[in-house]
């Protein structure tokens, strides 16, 4: 298969222009010609964007549709069994460590996984006969922005100090742990912390974060298998559940024998950080030099010069609406597109000015007989 990855920008910085750009992007895929669609709806924070994508897929696609991590009616759903592993996390805190005062940081109220994991927390607390008051539950954002706010809520004046804070994902867990450390709390001696998802960054954090590992790679593999299997019967759908695996670590007081794995993970993350820092530096200087450009050809020359220093990039093309030199504003993409900048195998082949049908996504000169992956 050739793979086209469409990634929206979201409402970063509360900028409406990003939303307009996302809405335009979701009109770009040739829905009728796709052999399969894999959706990660939980990564789309804008409700209107989600509904826009779902509407296009339902009305225009004639292929197997797979939704990962979120239930979508009429699609093949690859879901995580939140109950079994979240129960395992709570059991571990209560049975293995004897904790009774637990707090729970879930995700947004309207998020499928957030709802499931919170219900599981409440159910298990009820089973153990443990209370959970208003200040023991906090709605986060599944990201790192609300660690301080969550700690303010859990540690409010007059509230008993929690023995453990269970978070519905790893981003929030590391944010909470960082804030607790900043305030002088020891983890796990004063307050234990756990996450969920099994991100590698939980091993590089100090202390290593207790988590539940979600088999993302296997979910991706199964998605491709379903696309293969259901080419002739896309209307037949199924729900497949995957189990997460409990990974008790230092942040709850469990000193697991993962020293070698931790070292390997930290070495890989060090190498990845070096690549990311170099990429960021190259983009920074490229942006400065591009501000000096007066023509699109000069822009192409600058990009061609810097792409040699940016690891992971081999091909690059800039595609603009037809007539971009004459018109100042466009509503959506034009039927025909122009490619004024093209870099193939790190060789600058600009200026081509090649025109191509928008539905092709990329011009023929950038395509290959070998399977390709493009990020748009």
Feature names for model-found ranges:
Residues 319-376:
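GAF sensory domains
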Residues 293-333:
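Helix-loop-beta substructure at the N-terminus of cytosolic sensory domains
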Residues 20, 297-300, 368-374:
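Short linear interaction motifs
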Residues 1-297, 308-309, 315:
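Bacterial carbohydrate/catabolite-sensing allosteric modules
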């Amino acid at each position: 298969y050739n793979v086209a990855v469409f990634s929206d920008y979201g409402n970063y910085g509360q900028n409406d222009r990003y939303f307009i750009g996302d809405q335009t992007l979701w009109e770009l895929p040739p829905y009728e010609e796709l052999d399969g669609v894999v959706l990660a709806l939980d990564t789309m924070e804008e409700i209107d964007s989600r509904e826009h994508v779902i509407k296009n897929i339902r009305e225009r696609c004639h292929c197997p549709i797979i939704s990962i991590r979120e239930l979508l009616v009429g699609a093949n759903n690859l879901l995580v069994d939140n109950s079994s592993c979240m129960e395992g996390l709570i059991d571990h805190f209560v049975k293995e460590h004897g904790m009774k005062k637990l707090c729970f940081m879930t995700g947004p109220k309207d998020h499928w996984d957030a709802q499931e994991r919170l219900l599981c927390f409440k159910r298990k607390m009820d089973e153990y006969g443990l209370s959970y008051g208003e200040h023991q539950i906090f709605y986060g954002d599944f990201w790192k922005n609300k660690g301080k706010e969550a700690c303010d809520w859990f540690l409010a004046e007059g509230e008993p100090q929690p023995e453990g804070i269970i978070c519905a994902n790893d981003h929030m867990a590391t944010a909470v742990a960082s804030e607790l450390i900043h305030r002088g709390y020891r983890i796990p001696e004063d307050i234990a912390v756990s996450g969920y998802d099994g991100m590698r960054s939980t091993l590089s954090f100090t202390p290593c974060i207790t988590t539940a590992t979600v088999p993302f790679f296997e979910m991706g593999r199964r998605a491709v298998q379903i696309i293969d299997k259901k080419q002739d019967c896309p209307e037949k759908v199924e729900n497949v559940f995957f189990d997460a695996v409990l990974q008790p670590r230092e942040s709850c007081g469990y000193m697991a024998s993962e020293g070698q794995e931790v070292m390997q993970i930290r070495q890989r993350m060090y190498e990845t950080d070096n690549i990311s820092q170099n990429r960021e530096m190259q983009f920074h200087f490229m942006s400065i030099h591009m501000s000096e450009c007066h023509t699109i050809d000069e822009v192409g020359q600058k990009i061609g010069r810097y792409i040699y220093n940016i690891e992971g990039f081999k091909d690059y093309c800039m595609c603009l609406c037809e007539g971009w030199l004459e018109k100042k504003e466009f509503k959506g993409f034009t039927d025909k597109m122009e490619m004024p900048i093209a870099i193939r195998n790190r060789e600058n082949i600009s200026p081509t000015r090649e025109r191509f049908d928008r539905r092709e996504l990329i011009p023929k000169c950038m395509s290959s007989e070998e399977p390709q992956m493009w990020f748009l």
